[in-house]
């Protein structure tokens, strides 16, 4: 994405790019040959929705081409994608390590999965061929060709970006998920150490953690929209947010998989003890990785360091000394958790003719 001077230009370019990327994958999704196409279309819709949220104060979008309309399409894609993630987890990460008897016991789960996916794909197909999707893409394309950005549009992007981005970050810092399994020490929240697996399972099942993962993803997308306006100063934070999102995703995957098995296979824990143990082990490992990042992000100096960056756009802007010192002390590149499944992989390489639109 090229750097632009006005808020209207930045908003219009961003909306246009993400609309093009999202709609690029629609024909392949309807052919249903590679789950990666669905994944990329869903990501495109999420980024388009994020752009509408970030630039909401400046956008005057046509009816049927607004953020709730994008969200409705995204929900249909998400239902199907969740089933694909379950299939990849079971087939590639867990099934190869199961004893023969447990592998057979898992087969009814795959049958149930195929039935559920058939229904979900039928809904996605109807959605992408339906009037709502067609109105959304047509009217939004027309808007990008003749954008209406209201009175704030002509303002310099650098002047307005702090007012758009800092509130987004504040909502993340105020999320209650950060306080899961913490205790107050010296007037500051600290993660509780040495929890047993049973207690960890209780904490992992709390909706606050799932909500935090979604909020981290949302903020990461939001900051990526404006990252070019800050040079390379957001790169470390974006990488750390990605690692945190992956770790929380691992915790969430185990819950989603267990819920699926409860519906697919009666008494699955008794029939699949090895799988049950593997899921528990996966949660325990991811929990330790989560607590390391949790401790970092509960540090007020670390939080303020990112806030100070967002306050001063520009590739060559100088950070306040206190913020820079805090980041040198606390910022390390977070290790991404080992992940055998391609469930959250990046876009598969395609030939030049098949590449999605460049941003």
Report each predicted region and the residues it spans:
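Cationic, histidine-enriched alpha-helical/coil surfaces that engage anionic ligands
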Residues: 1-359
